[in-house]
From Swiss-Prot:
Transmembrane segments: none annotated. InterPro entries: Restrct_endonuc-II-like, tRNA_endonuc-like_dom_sf, UPF0102_YraN-like. This is UPF0102 protein Gura_3756. The lineage of its organism: Bacteria, Pseudomonadati, Thermodesulfobacteriota, Desulfuromonadia, Geobacterales. Belongs to the UPF0102 family.
Length: 127
């Protein structure tokens, strides 16, 4: 992959995360943290939906040539997100709090309104 392709993909990902934050806020989610990183993984968005802590993975694509965006949340990726979520919960002393894993899939076709699919409870805690 060329460096400009990587930069374009990073920019697309950042745009997708900004779109997802606006989408979630519009649905009364409280954004707690963005881009939480630890040695075992990363969580794009951590939010609250009422009393539930929601760990959100955002996937953005320009087209579906390689399948829908959510298809890239593989079992391996789910394990990484789960480990990062457990780390975050432990750091905040919230291991007993209700939590779930959502995916926000965004298709950002050229010059078009983004197509957003919010998949609640997209996967279970994975080890």
């Amino acid at each position: 992959m060329r460096s400009e392709d990587r930069a374009d993909n990073k920019s697309l990902g950042e745009q997708g995360e900004a779109i997802a934050v606006c989408y979630l806020k519009g649905r009364k989610y409280a954004i707690v943290e963005r881009n939480f990183r630890c040695k075992c993984g990363e969580v794009d968005i951590i939010a609250r939906d009422g009393k539930t802590i929601v760990f959100v993975e955002v996937k953005t694509r320009r087209n579906e040539a390689c399948g829908p965006p959510q298809a890239s949340v593989t079992p391996f990726k789910q394990r990484q997100i789960s480990k990062a979520a457990l780390t975050w919960l432990a750091k905040k002393m919230l291991l007993d709090a209700p939590a779930r894993f959502d995916v926000v899939a965004i298709l950002q076709r050229d010059h078009a309104v983004p197509e957003i699919e919010h998949i609640k409870d997209a996967f279970e805690l994975a080890y």
